Amino acid sequence: MTETKNADAGSVITDHVTLRYDYAIGEVAGRFMQGLKDGKILATRCSKSGLTYLPPRSYCERSFEKCDSWVEAGLEGVIETSTIVVRGFEGMRKAPVAIAFVRLDGTDSAIANYVDGLDLTNYETAMKRIAPGRRVRVEFAKAREGRITDFSFVCVD
């Protein structure tokens, strides 16, 4: 008979795991990502409710009807909420980074992305620049790949 020894409750196994994950993004996200590659921010619209969604959605949350058209969102908008992330994540931008949810002109929902061009050495000053209600504009990357990182926001004022 083999004796099994249980690990102590406080034991930790340290390992490094790298996973590759491929997934189908679907029709709506696919068209949105192609728009980004083409230098456009595309949103879906529901003619029944009159709502315009960004990120685009297949169905309207108000009418429960299929969103039936695509529109190009404005390239400026207002910050709904924001934060400064001070702890980095592997494979992502080096911290600190500013992130904001922005309602672009002509849309009824907000999309999150990085806010570039800020001096993040003074968090208090930076947070005032990205406070709710402040205006930002979209800035596209020179080389676009059809990913959410193809654009970021920069402060207008």
Model regions: which residues?
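Residues immediately within or flanking Cys/His clusters that coordinate Zn2+
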Residues: 40-43, 50, 57
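Short Cys/His-rich metal-coordination motifs, predominantly Zn2+-binding knuckles/fingers
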Residues: 47-50, 63-64, 107
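Conserved hydrophobic positions within beta-strands
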Residues: 77-79
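Short, conserved beta-turn/loop elements at beta-strand boundaries and strand-helix junctions
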Residues: 82-88, 107, 143
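OB-fold (S1/OB) nucleic-acid-binding surfaces
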Residues: 92-111
